[in-house]
Regions:
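Amphipathic heptad-repeat alpha-helical coiled-coil/stalk segments that mediate oligomerization
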Residues: 297-321
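Short amphipathic coiled-coil heptad-repeat segments
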Residues: 136-142, 267, 271, 287-292
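Extended non-transmembrane interhelical loops and adjacent amphipathic helices
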Residues: 113, 186, 283-294
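Proline-centered turn/helix-capping motifs that create local helix->coil transitions or kinks
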Residues: 277-281, 291-301, 378
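Short helix-capping and inter-helix turn/linker motifs at the boundaries of alpha-helical repeat units
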Residues: 143, 185, 259-260, 298
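ABC ATPase nucleotide-binding domains
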Residues: 251-271, 278-287, 303, 308, ...
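ABC ATP-binding cassette signature C-motif
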Residues: 1-253, 312-538
Length: 538
């Protein structure tokens, strides 16, 4: 249990929130949402003790332990991978180190012997004898093979370090768990494992995430940071979003009678409660929904960008033909081989792979930015493309302001460019910012504005939700669903894939798995699982 009392946090003159009084209880997973800069990560840092609040206090239940997903991926470079995970249970780790120091002595005093006996008793109580095997199992579940367990953290890639940090946070079943963007850099299979793991925990969990499906799958309550306040609502992200949209519509219709509004809200709650009846947390969630005061629901202050992709030209029937394509990484690793497919009009294809470099390599090849190791590709004569690369660093090395930067990529005067930027939530003095000082989210919104200028009939998107907040992801997602052209994309966002893709192509070192089916059917199909095992392990 975590009790927050009279918490206030401000930076300079800017007050993030004040008078925060909340109690987070065991058995609940709280999804923390809010606009970029609202203070989601700051709240977790204040709870963990990493940040001193301006006022107020945070208390854990008596004797309880708190674990945090570390954001510094270099902090443990000098340690063994397995030891890093074991450090997640600090009392156990300290016990192990003290035992090791005692037993390394050439001679032990009587006091040493008594202390060793105490340590052994506590070691057993903390399941110390199974600790290494449990830590190893946690690493394996998160995609870290046994061959890496004895290596130094400094030898791992950043993607691998992220998984070790997550294993460290989860290890030892802490009473309270704080997870800031836990799905970042995880493949979809590992995210699915994490969803299953968290759905069965009995601890108190707070999680910040921009993955809507993940939030919906795991959270029983939503912590909304808005209007300078921190408010807890019953239900998951989708319930919060739909209820907020409903409240906005009602606010806009001022003539609607109060009683009609109340009935509409109550009917909405009943309907949503029925829709979540299949969830694992259904009993507790339904009880919370029943207690919800409909008068508490209010429109969000958050803004959604206006993302509209329009085609200048209708595509013909020949979109893209790929034959025998192969890509090899710099170290000689085969990313994919013998890739053959034809893209037909209207198809929105998600590309998957165990190795994220495979999708990037494919997109770079078909955009002419990289040579294939073998094979050919051919675009249809009517096709125009707009490409959103994974790494956009090169686009933002100039000191141009946003208007001048965007003007490079399409026709139109300053007013037109400001209009595009305004729809992407850049207004007033923002449009005069230098592009080389933009945040990751601001850069991504600029890249999306650039793509809209192209009026292309085929969009190529490499992990497009990176750095975007939930509002931008929602707006992006909604427009792509209605886009009439073709889309080729990769993503770690389950909801994004499920709602946009109508075809799935998985790239493996031994060819492709190519299916016309939705994503949920694909990941839960036993036949597909068997086929994947075969294609990756030939």
């Amino acid at each position: 249990m975590i009790t927050v009392s009279n918490l206030a946090i401000q930076f300079g003159k800017r007050v993030l929130y004040k008078d925060v009084n909340l109690k987070f209880t065991a058995g609940n997973i709280y999804g923390v949402i809010g606009a970029n800069g609202a203070g989601k990560s700051t709240l977790l840092r204040a709870i963990s003790g990493d940040l001193e609040p301006n006022k107020g206090s945070v208390e854990l239940g008596p004797g309880e332990r708190l674990s945090v997903l570390e954001q510094d991926h270099f902090k443990f470079d000098e340690y063994r991978v397995l030891d890093t995970v074991l450090m997640g249970h600090e009392p156990l780790w300290n016990n192990m180190k003290e035992r090791e120091a005692l037993y390394s002595k050439l001679e032990m005093t009587e006091d040493d012997g008594n202390r060793a006996a105490d340590l052994e008793l506590k070691f057993a109580e903390m399941d110390g004898w199974e600790a290494e095997s449990n830590a190893a199992q946690m690493l394996s579940n998160l995609g870290i093979p046994e061959a890496l367990h004895e290596k130094q953290m400094s030898e791992l890639s950043n993607n691998e370090k992220v998984r070790v940090m997550l294993a460290k946070a989860l290890f030892g079943n802490p009473d309270n768990l704080l997870l800031d963007e836990p799905t970042n850099d995880l493949d979809l299979d590992t995210v699915q494992w994490l969803e299953e793991y968290l759905s069965n925990v009995e601890q108190t969990v707070l999680v910040v995430s921009h993955d809507r499906h993940f939030l919906d799958a795991v959270s029983t309550q939503t912590v909304d940071i808005d209007f300078g306040k921190v408010t807890v609502f019953a239900g998951n992200y989708s319930f919060w979003y739909e209820s907020s949209q409903l409240a906005l519509r009602q606010q806009q219709n001022q003539r609607q009678k109060a009683e009609e509004k109340r009935k509409e809200l109550e009917e909405f709650i009943r309907r949503f409660s029925a829709n979540v009846a299949k969830s694992k947390q259904t009993t507790s969630r339904k009880k919370m929904l029943e207690k919800l005061n409909v008068e508490e629901i209010r429109p969000s202050s958050r803004k959604y960008p206006g993302i509209i992709f329009q085609m200048e030209r209708e595509p013909g029937n020949q979109i893209l033909e790929v034959e025998g394509l192969k890509a090899v990484d710099e170290d000689g690793t085969v990313l994919f081989d013998n890739v053959n497919f034809n893209i037909e009009k209207g198809e929105k294809v998600v590309f998957l792979s165990h190795n994220p470099k495979a999708m990037t390599a494919l997109f770079e090849i078909i955009n002419g930015n990289r040579e294939a190791a073998a094979g050919t590709f051919k675009w249809g004569v009517t096709i125009t493309t707009a490409y959103l690369p994974l790494d956009n660093t090169e686009f933002f090395k100039s000191d141009k302001n946003l208007v001048d930067w965007l003007s490079q990529y399409g026709p139109g005067n300053e007013v037109v460019m400001k209009g595009f930027l305004g729809r992407m939530l850049f207004s007033g003095e923002d449009v005069l910012k230098k592009v080389n000082v933009l945040s990751g989210g601001e850069r991504m919104r600029c890249m999306i504005a650039r793509m809209q200028l192209n009026n292309a009939n085929c969009l190529i998107l490499d992990t497009p939700t990176n750095h975007l907040d939930l509002e931008s992801i929602q707006a992006f997602n909604n427009n792509l669903v209605g886009f009439k052209g073709n889309i080729l994309f990769s993503s770690h966002d389950h909801e994004f894939i499920q709602t946009v893709a109508n075809r799935i192509i998985e790239l493996t070192p031994n060819g492709t798995i190519d299916k016309l089916m939705d994503y949920d059917d694909y990941i839960y199909s036993e036949d597909i699982k068997a086929l994947k095992a075969q294609m990756y392990n030939k």
